[in-house]
Amino acid sequence: MTSTDPPLAGVRVLDAVPGPLGAIGRFLGELGAEVIRIEPRGGGADRTAGATLDGIGLAFAAANLGKRVATIDLPADAARFVALAREADILLEARLPGLDLDAVRAANPALVVVSISDFGEQGPWRDWRASDAVLHALTGGLSRSGLPGRPPLLPPGELTFQTAAPQIAWLALAAFIARLRTGKGDRLEVALLEAAMQALDPGYGLSGSAQSGVPLWKMARGRTDERHRYPIFRCADGFVRLCVLAPRQWRGMFRWMGEPPEFAGPEWEKLPTRYRSAALLEAFARFLAPMTRAEVEAGAVAHGVPAAGLLDVSEAIATPQMVARHAFAPVEVAPGVSLPFPNGVVDIDGTRAGIRGPAPAPGGDARFESARPAFDAPSPADMPFAGLKVLDMGVIVVGGDTGRLFADLGAEVVKVENGAFPDGQRQSRDNAPVSLTFAAGHRNKRGLAIDLRSARGKALFLDLVARADVLCSNFKPGTLTSLGFDAKTLAAANPRLVTVDSSAFGPTGPWSDRLGYGPLVRCSAGLTKQWVYPGEPESFSDTITVYPDHVAARIGACAAAALLIRRMRTGRGGGASISQAEVMLAQKGAEIAALGAEAAGLRLETGEMADDWLLPCAGDDEYCVATIRDVADRAALAGIVGEERAAAGQWAARHSPEEVMAQLQAAGVPAGMMVRVTDMPDSPQYRALGTFRPATHPLIAAPFTVEGRATRSERLPDPDQRPAPRIGEDSAAVVADWLGLDEAAVAALLADGIIEQAA
């Protein structure tokens, strides 16, 4: 970052989390924190995990950019560890052997301790081991991934670890803000199981708009064929995907195709009609087949049709958009050898919050060096964001989740809409006023309906901005400016305002104005081509996810929280922007570095790699995942079933998935049964953790299940469960409360249609 005042400047983080979750500390470092990694003499084992170049693991480098190292062996060096912790603000640790946490907290009662374990510190699975594949199985994603009639398909990469990292960073920052307000530290007990579930594809949170308000727990038991929602077609040089959803998009597609008469009727404006039509899909295929990906994209832009070519990762990182935004930067990983790595995921005040240095060499003896700033924090409160006013202009998943994260921790979040342009999350197949997913994802908010196209509505909104602390949005770049709310206007109305916006490709660059539905962004970032069955390049199966929406919301919330922390020491606001495509690619750091090594003709070494086994179990479509990490796991597995995968499959087929999971975990092998979303609330570990709880809504007939607590904490209360608002449900009260308007003034706004009040 070239900014002279990054938002977390002066915040000190002690990072004792090895492996891929080192990304938590790296992200906090990109936002400006001083991060010191703790590792034993000789270096941590994660330094040489996976692909290595000259003995340096690329995954290690990706997770630890910008950190320094303190070499500490516990318990022998306990005094040195306590001395470092005494000077820290946040301690990240993952069951660090030899750690005397009581001594650490006695030395620094204001320390925020984030203790991370695979399954939490209570419940029957508390001592079990997880892997990315195991977490996919246990968080509901695996059961939906793949094609009908086929075995489930493990998603590519390390999505559960990589999405959990920003969720944990968010919890750490929220607890730190609470510390700044109260002077008291905290200990968060974070279960990776929950963090991954919440930030990837939460079964009891917001789902994509194509679900039409139907939550994931109401979907069919098996894997359903969702490819018609976001269909992929072969073209002259590969594949392209269309996302023709809105009527205006269909009209653009119809004109582009030459207005074929067989599709001219008004019924084709309706999404269900188009979804059900094999003839329409065949017509799309014939029309697109002669064109290249670039020609399809150009034609789609000209006609207002959402479309994207399918890229592989090497193509994705070289697009004009990524080059223009400096999304990747070279980092020296060995003497004289530099490789490309993701250059952060957030723009702060128009400047990239990117790489702050290489990964550290082993053997360091780092001490904290950053100056201690003075923070002018709000008065103490039970919730970290109590008293904070948030204008939530976000839509669908990213926007909805960003606002809810603040609302759940005490902020007054006002969802800004208009009756003529409601949030697409409100749509439901039964035309209910509040869908189940909307009710889950917008709890604890107030509703304001305002006419932002009128001069009086604009002026009223700027009056609200003047009293707000945070403004969230995820429109296509330029939308707020077109309404008269550009960055300068907002800052003039309120110099202390913090803004956070999220878009498909970011606010700058040649692709900034592209229509950016998640399925298209996944194509442009290389993920769609990877989410296929081995050896079957056309078995595309990524339609079951809304990734990266939920994790992008966490990244945006973290950026906003960081700017609020900066505001406590400077008095000024700021802006954060997130590109969802860059979020995806940033979570492929080691893979991108390996591609750079390959392009440079460098030879990578790979030791023993973890191997994920998908084991069919007794029952109907029942499976268990096992991850064989090393020789010890192979020996443990051999002691149960023999060394061959075929023998393991035969053994598993005679047992229930619960039995297979339990026996493998008892032998020390990471394993997880394939859990369906509908079964998660009754899972013994989720019950022990208190992950879910029942909720009600006055417009929904029966109680329903939602996420409860995000983690266990000594000081952070569980979130409230105030019902999600109808459009404009609180309009009159909001303008009266925020602006001090009397009844006559509010009545005039209502009478003139400047604001709307739900009946």
For each feature predicted by the language model, list its residue ranges.
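The feature captures the short pre-catalytic strand/loop hairpin that immediately precedes
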Residues: 139-155, 527-544, 714-715
